[in-house]
């Protein structure tokens, strides 16, 4: 697929695309697995980035010969939060920050009249914390979170939901994603997908994307 001649809308994932939060989330998940007696590594937990955990959590447990469901993991996570072992929302951590160039790209897109949206698997209560802390909320015309859709990435529903709300055609929509599941979701929705590799810590396989973006300073769509 070639890049759209006219771009009406750009839809962004959040974690690892707007906010460099994935390393923080992975470290938190190491603690949770440890509470369950599973010696998961930081690298193991990075495989959970961009996904809802229904397949990745059992896979991590299986690696160490332990059966575990996503429901059991999230119950243990709640116990860790209640015990003060981990912060409930990664966006509150001092080391959390936006990726370099994020605010500038969003301002340029909006100045050019391009609609912008945030499409994330993360639940809305957490996303709102990040948007508020980093002053991102006013920069989006649409926000779709994990608790707003029945099916998550790699299913196309999250991106289709955003495009339906904004009344835009996928042929004129660009998606920015940093995970294999997110890339597949954007492609399945019929969009042109940029595979973002701008995080210094986490670089997932985005080779299936239509184009790879290494930095927002190279972002030339607007």
Report residues per predicted region:
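Conserved G/P- and acidic residue-centered "switch" motifs that form tight phosphate/ATP-binding loops
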Residues: 13, 17, 120, 178
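Asp-based, Mg2+/Mn2+-dependent phosphohydrolase catalytic module
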Residues: 1-10, 103-110, 114, 123-222
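Helix N-cap/coil-helix junction residues
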Residues: 38-40, 66, 136, 167-168
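Alpha-helical substrate-recognition element adjacent to the catalytic core
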Residues: 35-65
């Amino acid at each position: 697929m070639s890049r759209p001649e006219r771009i009406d809308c750009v839809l962004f994932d959040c974690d690892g695309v707007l906010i460099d939060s994935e390393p923080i989330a992975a470290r938190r998940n190491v603690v949770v697995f440890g509470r369950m007696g599973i010696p998961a590594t930081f690298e193991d937990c990075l495989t959970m980035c961009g996904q809802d955990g229904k397949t990745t959590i059992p896979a991590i447990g299986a690696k160490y010969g332990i059966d575990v469901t996503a429901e059991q993991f999230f119950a243990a996570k709640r116990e860790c939060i209640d015990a003060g072992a981990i912060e409930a929302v990664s966006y509150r951590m001092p080391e959390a920050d936006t990726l370099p160039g994020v605010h500038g790209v969003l301002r340029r897109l909006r100045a050019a009249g391009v609609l912008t949206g945030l499409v994330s698997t993360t639940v809305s209560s957490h996303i709102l914390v990040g948007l508020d802390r980093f002053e991102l909320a006013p920069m989006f015309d649409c926000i779709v979170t994990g608790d707003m859709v029945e099916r998550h990435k790699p299913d196309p529903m999250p991106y289709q939901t955003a495009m339906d709300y904004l009344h835009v055609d996928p042929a004129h929509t660009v998606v920015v994603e940093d995970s294999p599941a997110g890339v597949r979701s954007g492609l399945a929705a019929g969009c042109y997908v940029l595979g973002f590799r701008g995080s210094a810590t986490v670089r997932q396989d985005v080779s299936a994307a239509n184009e790879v973006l290494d930095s927002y300073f190279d972002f030339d769509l607007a």
